[in-house]
């Protein structure tokens, strides 16, 4: 994976803070990727988000493959203590996101503008149909309502002729606002920072707020209420204007029981929406994550024996070009879709498609270096005999020492685990890989992450040593990931010698050293 060098003229001096959202379970892949691709430092994580510092420019950050969305970080802090505060106090605490440190907002806006100005393929984030934050039905997240614009006009009329300080002191009883003299002093102290910004640009800025509330926060305050409070605070503090339909900028806020995060999306479309994939099958971030641990090397033959629309092959070929790829499937419709994807991506010369059953591949034994595949989730293949015959055929065509990465449903994963033999050590010290990242249980602590208790490990760590699915296939590591409505497991195996090469010899400790290093990385709470 090549490290992208940033244009010296576009680097944030000394590095800037960003965060990416990620599918649950993909945090370790994203942490490793930002370090390798962006030379990122201060890499931290929480469930679904990875924070990092980098000097990379926007074109470099656009190359991230395991991330969903990319944001400039404005603020991250401990959660609002909703259980100990009444609603008015909670709303007042939310105003402090803006009022306590307006300089951080101006710095983030300045960075956002700078990154977009230096992007050769600049996106217009203010397009009418732009919606940089995908919303799911049923989630409590909203944009500032039209009422915000009405209130803005009312306040302008009411406060005409009053000083900015008088405006800051006037709160709305409906929202439980209570701006204090201390906050006013903070505003004065930060006035030098505000003056340093381009005043005209700030006044002309239009915005909207997208707020997501989860956990207990959701029970006390709605996303709409939170968005209104932040929106009004921004209008009073900076003179910005709310624009629901065509804003210059969108502010994203997530309030949960574990953290409060505020940021600015850098791109209109998600990073996970690949421009080179015409018809999506498996989610591209999952496909890339699978390929990233498959030990693909130049000159290798990589096979997906159940390729479907070819997403895994396309993702791998985009990242590792000097490799020959082959995809097989029994469905004519799937192969036609895969062919369209290959043409759209310009990869027809490097990926060959053939119609074949996964249980009867037209390939010589030990002819394949890497196998990567998404095993159908019980819709086409039954547990037991079918999955066993599939794995036996994959084992046959995979060379000794070759890697196999499979995406397994929970049922398939459980079946292979239950059918496994005795425990097999994966390293000389008997270590196994943990499928899920762990965060601190105590958000007030700093330093090294807490060590999981035996009961926690028992519930989260699958005994990979028991997952010896077939003959010479030895388990290496496993990661539990979310596919949206369901969960799955990314499982990696290596093929041992038929004569009995031990799993410890087959296993490469470097992979676990890397994962262990990521698991020791600080969580969000370490830096709060």
From Swiss-Prot:
SUPFAM superfamilies for this protein: S-adenosyl-L-methionine-dependent methyltransferases, THUMP domain-like
Extent of the signal sequence: none
Domain THUMP residue range list: 162-266
PROSITE patterns in the record: THUMP
CDD domains on file: AdoMet_MTases, THUMP_AdoMetMT
Enzyme superclass (EC): transferase
Catalytic reactions of this protein: guanosine in U6 snRNA + S-adenosyl-L-methionine = N(2)-methylguanosine in U6 snRNA + S-adenosyl-L-homocysteine + H(+)
InterPro entries: RlmKL-like_Mtase, SAM-dependent_MTases_sf, THUMP_dom
Bias (Basic and acidic residues): 154-168
Region (Disordered): 154-200, 437-460
One GO term (biological process): RNA processing
UniProt keywords, alphabetically: Methyltransferase, Nucleus, RNA-binding, Transferase
Task performed by this protein: Catalytic subunit of the THUMPD2-TRM112 methyltransferase complex, that specifically mediates the S-adenosyl-L-methionine-dependent N(2)-methylation of guanosine nucleotides, most probably at position 72 (m2G72), in the U6snRNA of the major spliceosome. This modification in the U6 snRNA affects the constitutive splicing efficiency of introns that have suboptimal splice sites and can impact final mRNA levels.
Lineage of source species: Eukaryota, Metazoa, Chordata, Craniata, Vertebrata
E.C. designation(s): 2.1.1.-
Location in or out of the cell: Nucleus
Family assignment from sequence similarity: Belongs to the methyltransferase superfamily.
Protein name stated in the entry: U6 snRNA (guanine-N(2))-methyltransferase THUMPD2
Keyword Ribonucleoprotein: no
Entry GO MF terms: RNA binding; U6 snRNA (guanine-N(2))-methyltransferase activity
GO CC term (a single one): tRNA methyltransferase complex
Subunit-level organization: Part of the heterodimeric THUMPD2-TRM112 methyltransferase complex; this complex forms an active tRNA methyltransferase, where TRMT112 acts as an activator of the catalytic subunit THUMPD2.
